[in-house]
């Protein structure tokens, strides 16, 4: 019976990277693990199939060989003289000829080292005030931690993992493939070089247990959306005493009702009435440090920016503090009573109408442009 494609076993495309392959393996291994399917021979066979596919596709050299030659790259006789040796003499060094493809598949391989723990990611949402000032937050994350009973060995206290009698601790076995020898993962110990005869009752021989741990994370002042904080060694525990992975805290800053942030500068809109815009005055504006007075000069136009130095965000990497830029928005009055309408009518007449040249230079420029446009059309 033909063996199933390794990519199909893990449910990943042939273009999948190592991260995608590991994610698929972890999901399937949890589903079909013998400890969760005791007595289920079909699940046990599926688990072995998944593990075999994972070991091949996460080894760069073996994956390259599989992509080029399929299962024949690893099966007894699959790469014999007919497959590779037809054009070479008996004295050829096949490990040199095919080294670029197979790497350390040829020659004396080494056992699989215990894997470093996986890195973890935590998405943390902050308010703008928390991001600007810095904050310490407690988080809870599900992870794999070293078993406290066996200290990660997987063996019951008082016992030790035994050297694999098949590979004698090498983690690999040598098989003859036509004119040369090929190293394969030891099928007895799955490449670890050791066997656990008496597994730990707490972790069932895995050396790690699932836990949810609480961490206190210090967020420095000045962080922004997209910043990432690394907590070394706070990821998943490694296998058999290998180093733990890292935890990466990904920052996301919530939208603020008043301020917008661009780099280390803050922006806000300040509405003023048209009388203040024309005559000038002072208005109270918010900052992250409290309220301050902004002086508005006379004849201020809508969209005018006023810079308040040092009222922005201090860079997380040090250096000068950003500024607060207040954008003035001149509001048109609404809900006018008869007296206010009469006063405005009188004011407009004093301007010489809607396009008064002296008091509304932009209006004059605009209407002059409109007149020229229509004059040009009629010529």
UniProtKB/Swiss-Prot annotation:
Gene from which the chain derives: dnaJ
Domain comment, as recorded: The J domain is necessary and sufficient to stimulate DnaK ATPase activity. Zinc center 1 plays an important role in the autonomous, DnaK-independent chaperone activity of DnaJ. Zinc center 2 is essential for interaction with DnaK and for DnaJ activity.
Keyword Cytoplasm annotated: yes
GO BP terms in the entry: chaperone cofactor-dependent protein refolding; DNA replication; protein refolding; response to heat
Protein species of origin: Cronobacter sakazakii (strain ATCC BAA-894)
Upper taxonomic lineage: Bacteria, Pseudomonadati, Pseudomonadota, Gammaproteobacteria, Enterobacterales
CXXCXGXG motif repeat ranges per the UniProt record: 147-154, 164-171, 186-193, 200-207
Cofactor: Zn(2+)
Name of the protein this chain belongs to: Chaperone protein DnaJ
Function description: Participates actively in the response to hyperosmotic and heat shock by preventing the aggregation of stress-denatured proteins and by disaggregating proteins, also in an autonomous, DnaK-independent fashion. Unfolded proteins bind initially to DnaJ; upon interaction with the DnaJ-bound protein, DnaK hydrolyzes its bound ATP, resulting in the formation of a stable complex. GrpE releases ADP from DnaK; ATP binding to DnaK triggers the release of the substrate protein, thus completing the reaction cycle.
């Amino acid at each position: 019976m033909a063996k199933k494609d390794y990519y199909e076993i893990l449910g990943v495309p042939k273009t999948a990277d190592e991260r995608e392959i590991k994610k698929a393996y972890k999901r399937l291994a949890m589903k079909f693990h013998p400890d969760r399917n005791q007595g289920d021979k079909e699940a046990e066979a599926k688990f072995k199939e998944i593990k075999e596919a994972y070991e091949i596709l996460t080894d760069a050299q073996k994956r390259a060989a599989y992509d080029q030659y399929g299962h024949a790259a690893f099966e007894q006789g699959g790469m014999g003289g007919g497959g590779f040796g037809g054009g070479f003499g008996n004295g050829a060094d096949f490990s040199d000829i095919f080294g670029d493809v197979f790497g350390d598949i040829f020659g004396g391989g080494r056992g699989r080292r215990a894997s470093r723990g996986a890195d973890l990611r935590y998405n943390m949402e902050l308010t703008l005030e928390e991001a600007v000032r810095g904050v310490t937050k407690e988080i809870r994350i599900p992870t794999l931690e070293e078993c406290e009973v066996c200290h990660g060995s997987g063996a019951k206290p008082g016992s030790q993992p035994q050297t694999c009698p098949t590979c004698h601790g090498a983690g690999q076995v040598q098989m003859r493939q036509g004119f040369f020898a090929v190293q394969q993962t030891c099928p007895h110990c799955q490449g670890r070089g050791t066997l656990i005869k008496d597994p730990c009752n707490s972790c069932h021989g895995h050396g790690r247990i699932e836990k949810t741990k609480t961490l206190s994370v210090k967020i420095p002042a000045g962080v922004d959306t997209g910043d990432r904080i690394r907590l070394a060694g706070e990821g998943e525990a490694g296998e058999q005493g290998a180093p733990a992975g890292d935890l990466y805290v990904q920052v996301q800053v919530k939208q603020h009702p008043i301020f917008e942030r661009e780099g280390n500068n803050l922006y806000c809109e300040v509405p003023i009435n048209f009388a203040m815009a024309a005559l000038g005055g002072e208005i109270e504006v918010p900052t992250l440090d409290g309220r301050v007075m902004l002086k508005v000069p006379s004849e201020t136009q809508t969209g005018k920016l006023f810079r308040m130095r040092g009222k922005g965000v201090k860079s997380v990497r040090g250096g000068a503090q950003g500024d607060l830029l207040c954008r003035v928005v001149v509001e048109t009055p609404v809900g006018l009573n008869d007296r206010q309408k009469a006063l405005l009518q009188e004011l407009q007449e004093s301007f010489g109408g809607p396009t008064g040249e002296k008091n509304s230079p932009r209006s004059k420029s605009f209407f002059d442009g409109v007149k020229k446009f229509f004059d040009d059309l009629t010529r």
